[in-house]
Amino acid sequence: TGRKLYYISAEFLIGKLLSNNLINLGLYDEARDALAAVGKSLSDIEEVEPEPSLGNGGLGRLAACFLDSLATLNLPGDGVGLRYHFGLFHQSFEDGVQNEKPGPWLTAHSWAEKTDITYPVELAGKEYTARLYKLAVTGYEGRTNTLNLFDLDTIDESIVHDGIAFDKTAIDKNLTLFLYPDDSDEAGRRLRVYQQYLMVSAGAQLILAECAARGCDYHDLADYAAIQINDTHPSMVIPELIRLL
C-alpha cells in the first residue's frame, strides 16, 4: 500500500484555484471557449474569485508548492491545516494611515467542502469539536490529493469589530478567525497555542483514523504514514501523537 505523506502547516498560500484547476485538468481552453460562445470572459470570472486566505508569505507558498508537486508527481501526500475565516487581514491606506480590516473569502461556494468528520480536542479543560473540511489539490495531468482543513462550527465572525479587534478569550468563537492573531498580550499568546494544538490534535487523529481504515497496526504506523512539520507551529504533533497512541 505504501506510505502517505501528511504535510502539516499553519499556512497554505494556494492562491486562486479556478484557472489552476482548469489548466491541471486540461479543461482551460474548453471552458474559455464555452464562455466566449455565450459572450462571457473567463478572465473576468477569475478576477472576482476570492483568494483563499489560508497563508501569508514564503512559508505558506512553500507548503502550497509541495502539495502541487506531490499531486503532479502522482505521490500520495495531503496537507493538514486550519480553515481561517479571515486569514491575516486586508490592508488599505486612507490619508496616509494604515487600516486593517478582515478579508472574508468563505462563501457557500467555497472550494473547501464541509464533511461530517469531526474529532474531539480538549483545550484548557474544555472539549471542542474540530470539523474537517476537504479542499482538492489537483496536479498537472496527475492525481488529486487533499488539503485537510479544521475549523469549529461555533466560530462567530460577528465578534470582530473596530478593524480586526475581537475578544481573544472567547475560544469557541475566535479560534480560527485569523492567521497569526495578535500575540502582544497573554490572551493572544494563549490563542496562538490553542490554534496550533487544535491543528495538530485533530490532524493526528485524522492520520490515525486513515491509517486504521487501511488496516494499519499502530506499531507499524511508520510504514503507512510520514509526517512533515512545516516550521515550528505544528511541532506539538510529536508529543500529541505519542499521547494518542
Residue ranges of model-derived segments:
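A conserved ligand/cofactor-binding region detector
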Residues: 1-245
